[in-house]
Amino acid sequence: MQEGKISQIIGPVVDVDFPEGQLPAILDALSIAKPDGTKIVLETQQHLGEERVRTVAMESTDGLIRGMAVENTGRPIQAPVGEGVLGRMLNVVGDPIDGRGPVDAKKTYSIHRSAPKFEDLSTKAEMFETGIKVIDLLEPYSRGGKTGLFGGAGVGKTVLIMELINNIAKQQSGYSVFAGVGERTREGNDLWHEMMESGVIDKTALVFGQMNEPPGARARVALTGLSIAEYFRDEENRDVLLFIDNIFRFTQAGSEVSALLGRMPSAVGYQPTLATEMGELQDRITSTKNGSVTSVQAIYVPADDLTDPAPATAFAHLDATTVLSRSIAELGIYPAVDPLDSTSRILDPNIVGDDHYDTAQAVKMILQRYKDLQDIIAILGMDELSDEDKLVVSRARKVQRFLSQPFFVAEAFTGLSGKYVKLEETIKGFKEIIAGKHDNLPENAFYLVGTIEEAIEKAKTL
C-alpha cells in the first residue's frame, strides 16, 4: 500500500506528498489514522507536479499536522449497499452514525459511477401517484423522473419531502433513500425520530452530511445516497425513491472548495465546473429497463431569485417542478405550492388521459382569471365585478382552499389527521367545484380537507 505524508493543510484542503511514480489516481480515497484511533478520509482532486496531490477532506481536519502518514486505499470512497443499510443512518464514507453497531452490508459500491448506457434506459412515461392533491392534479411526478421542490427559507420543502416518504412507504411499500445534504442537523434528527415512530424507517436508508460538516462531505454525500439507490435499481430490479434535501447545498459545498483548489470563480462566485458537477449527479438518476430511481430534490432558492446560477442549472435537468410560494404560505394554505408556477412534462393527455388533463387546465384557467381580477378587486372592490366574474372569484377561492391538505407528518402542528387522496378522488372533487356543484358551500369548508365528501361534511359543522 502506497504511503505519503501531509505537506500542507488549508482548512478542508490537504496536500499530500508521495514518492515519485506512486501518485494516487484522481478521485481515489486516502486514509489518515489519527492518534486517538479515528481515521479521516481524503479524496484526491488534483495532481500538483510529480510528487504531490491536493485532496479534500470528508471530515474536519482538526488535529492533523504536517508530516502525518497518509495511506492510499487505491480506490474511490465505497458506500455499503443492499438490504443491510435499510433502517440505518450513515455518513458520507458509509460509516453508521446512529449508534446501533456496524452495518451488515454484503457489498460496497464506489460513489463515483458512470451513468447507465443509452441502450439500457427506459423511455416509458408513467405517472407516479403521491396522494397529495395539488401535485397529482397539476404537476404529476413521473416514475423514474426528476422533480424539483423550489422555495425560499421556511416555506415547507422539508415537510413536503417527509410527507412524500411517509406516503410512499405506507401506500406503495417502496424503498426510499434520503440524502441530507448540508441541511439542519435538528431536521435530520426530527426526521429520524418521526420515521422510527411511524414505522417507515425499515424501508428507508438515510445518508447525512449536514451543515456542520466540512464541504467535502456535503459535496459527496448525495453521491453516496445515489449509489445505494442504484444498487436497488440495478441488482434488485426495484423502483426506488431518492430524496435529496438540499441540492443547492451540493453546489454550495462545491463552490466552497473550488477557490481553495485554485479554480477561477465564475458567475456570482460559483465554481466554473458547476454545470458538469450537476450533470454527473443528475445523469445517474434515471430509469433503466430493470428498475427506476425517482428523485425528489429540494432546491433552496437564494433570496427567492430563480435566475441564480445554482437553481437555474438544476432546472435544466428536471421533469417536474413544484414551486413553493411565500405568498401562498402567508394565506395559510399548506402545502404552499404555487399552482400556476409549477410544471410537469407529463401533464399531457396522451400520458395522463383527457379527463385529468382537462380538469388540470380548467383549474389553472380559473386561478389565472382570479389572479388577473385581483388588481381590480384591490382598487374597486368586489361589487364592481360582473356577476360572471363574481362567480369565477368565488369558485377560484374554493379551488385555492381545496388545494390545501392536512399532512400526516404535520399532525402535531395542525391537530388534524393526515389524508392520502387517490387521483380519481382528486379529479372528481375539482371537476365538481368548477362545474358549480358546490357553489352553495362556504369556502372555509374546502380548507384543509382530503376529498370533496369531507368538504361537504365539514360545511355542515360551520
UniProtKB/Swiss-Prot annotation:
The gene is atpD. This is ATP synthase subunit beta. It is a peripheral membrane protein. It is found in: Cell inner membrane. GO terms for cellular component: plasma membrane; proton-transporting ATP synthase complex. InterPro entries: AAA+_ATPase, ATP-synt_VA_C, ATP_synth_F1_bsu, ATPase_a/bsu_AS, ATPase_alpha/beta_chains, ATPase_F1/V1/A1_a/bsu_N, ATPase_F1/V1/A1_a/bsu_N_sf, ATPase_F1/V1/A1_a/bsu_nucl-bd. The lineage of its organism: Bacteria, Pseudomonadati, Chlorobiota, Chlorobiia, Chlorobiales. It catalyses: ATP + H2O + 4 H(+)(in) = ADP + phosphate + 5 H(+)(out). SMART domains: AAA. It comes from the Bacteria. It is an enzyme of class 7 (translocase). Transmembrane segments: none annotated. F-type ATPases have 2 components, CF(1) - the catalytic core - and CF(0) - the membrane proton channel. CF(1) has five subunits: alpha(3), beta(3), gamma(1), delta(1), epsilon(1). CF(0) has four main subunits: a(1), b(1), b'(1) and c(9-12).
